[in-house]
Amino acid sequence: KYVFSETKSGFGLSYTPYLTKLVNDISLGNLTYFNRINERSAFAVSLRYFSLGEIEIIQDEFSQALIEKPNEMTMDISYSLRLADQFSMGVALRYLRSDLRIGSVDPDAKAASSFGVDLSAYYQGEEQNFGDIDGRIRAGAIIQNLGPKIKYDESGRETFLPTNLRIGGGFDFLLDQYNTVSVTAEVNKLLVPTPPILGREYNFSDINENGVYDDGIDELGELVSTDPVIYQGQSADVDFMSGIFQSFSDAPGGFSEELKEFTWALGAEYKYDDSFALRAGYFNESEEKGARKFLALGAGFKFSGTKVDLSYLFSASKVPSPLENTLRFSLTFDFGSNEYLEY
């Protein structure tokens, strides 16, 4: 999307506190720099840091408390190329480091690291007349975090990266030279295997050959059973590429459950002269898959190459969420404004 920017380059930072109803030291910070190299290409670099705050570890009543500071970090570099006047594609390379170890409890644990790739496409149409309305169509798609599994120790279980497929579209109502109303819609699918439902198989045999099946009993007098076996669904013990394709058909509840694994979101924005904006949005997730439902209100201001954006999150779910009442803040500095004219 940077390749459609009217600004030559820019630097942005954002800060989001999390779980403010419970603690005050968990937060997500992000730094981004982008540069539109020419009419056809742009690049960006970013750093994202998620702090889980301080965790106090007390092993027993006689030990001194130890402080651990788990965190996660990603570093990205991306490049986008304009393949046509209204269409571009991009690729991003990402390094991920997850340090969730509790060294005072497990000295053998270590920080885990991996890499991921994002592939994206974006379309931004020209201004057109649709009957009584002047408008512009926008659409995009992205696959995020394509990469190998991650694990925290040599003998530990490997974990999938949160690979996501996001597809969205929008329409800009160009009311006049100064006023624009935009509406957007987006769907998201997590591209990792759904955990299967497990069960056990028990052994019943005709031990004394009297024509009646007897319970298989071991030396402790307990029923003999197998290790857990898949009762419904498919095995999640696959590589990350197989997991992507499997994620569309492996829900234990069948197709109806697959549909519940899609989240969707709607958004609207009013913008005046590219200097002031009001925003509202809604996010929905099935109650069987996390029950996240949020309303968001936001505003943006731009003055002399500096943009400030604020948003506030409200929970709309019946299930209380620790993410509700979250305030998000971002600040962007543009350099070389209006160097490129797109409309």
Give the ranges of each region predicted by the language model.
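Subset of outer-membrane beta-barrel
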Residues: 1-343
